[in-house]
């Protein structure tokens, strides 16, 4: 990977991004290693910046310029990434990440395309009142669905996700059963933050998620978080497929 040198431009404060280095089409992931994996699927890749958990690359996919960036875990840090990517010129941001499934039909390796997200993120209430919806762009949902439908043997669904601000439960417990009964597909930690920021900043957005556990099977076993094993082959292969699908959708959408 080549390292970019644009000394004359002003970089953003946290991610160190310069507008000339960023494509309007951006794919974001939590894990810096996953960002590097996505970069390996592209050509003519330039390492834009690597600061803290934020690793950013720009390259081409099927001849289209795309940027991939990692945002770490949780809505607070991710919000800084989304804001700075928009400052640097992003017009489309898609998040690809892992999730827990609330629906028994969708187990490890299944994919969810988000139409929106429940705002339990702990971040967006300070940006705009809770009545403001966290929704994906219709065009982005359609593009992700179209690519998913071409994947042989893929079990996927489209619907609402739950974004939570924390991973481990405390004395208050959780409301997983309620959200499952309400038809929420699964739980993750950043989507609603992206959707709200994209909405108020006026860009297109979306999210696709690979199931790395079925929430209720591990809770019924009485092991709780100790039964969480996200590094199995079926999950790793699902992550790779998710990244390929997201990259194709980002590269083919009209802006």
Please tell me what each predicted stretch does.
Residues 44-50, 151-159, 253-255:
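Flexible, glycine/charged-enriched surface loops at secondary-structure junctions
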Residues 27-28, 32-35, 71-78, 133, ...:
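Generic structural signal for well-ordered, non-membrane alpha-helical segments
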Residues 134-182:
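Active-site rim beta-loop-alpha module in soluble metabolic enzymes
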Residues 2-142:
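Metabolite-binding pocket within alpha/beta catalytic cores that recognizes anionic/polar moieties
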